[in-house]
């Protein structure tokens, strides 16, 4: 039975095209490693995916007047095209938008909660009464109410 190798690459936010630094800093080295181990007869699983729910996606969607889903879908498709063009050999390049990811995330959360590793707490957050939503930290600019930094974001 061949040795099993897992290569897990960091998931890029799907809010912009992958730049040369992303490609050469994580995806290409992972691919080189996977190819090496495959040549050595090892069973390799190289995985990654698009982070479709991060704050950068929401920020870009708001700035463009479109939904976060539209931003994610466009960039995820371009990621796949790029990897195919340069020959990156992912066994699975998925996203945080799949039903499987949702299921596994919920399972991890409920398992932690059921075993006493999570707790309920109250936290102050910025809220817009005009937009009727809470603001992520990247949307809040001005003087920090905690440290007094006048250029806080």
Predicted segments, located by residue:
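N-terminal, positively charged nucleic-acid-binding surface of large information/translation enzymes
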Residues: 1-153
């Amino acid at each position: 039975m061949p040795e099993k190798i897992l290569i897990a690459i960091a998931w890029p936010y799907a809010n912009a095209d992958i730049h040369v630094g992303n490609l050469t800093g994580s995806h290409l080295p992972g691919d080189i490693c996977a190819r090496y181990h495959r040549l050595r007869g090892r069973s390799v699983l190289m995985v990654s995916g698009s982070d479709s729910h991060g704050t950068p996606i929401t920020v870009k969607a708001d700035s463009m007047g479109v939904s976060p889903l539209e931003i994610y879908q466009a960039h995820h498709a371009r990621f796949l095209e790029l990897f195919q063009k340069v020959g990156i050999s992912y066994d699975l390049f998925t996203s945080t938008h799949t039903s499987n990811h949702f299921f596994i995330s919920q399972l991890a959360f409920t398992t932690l909660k059921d075993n006493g590793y999570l707790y309920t707490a109250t936290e102050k957050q910025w809220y817009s009464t005009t937009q009727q939503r809470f603001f992520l930290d990247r949307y809040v600019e001005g003087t920090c109410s905690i440290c007094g930094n006048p250029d806080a974001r």
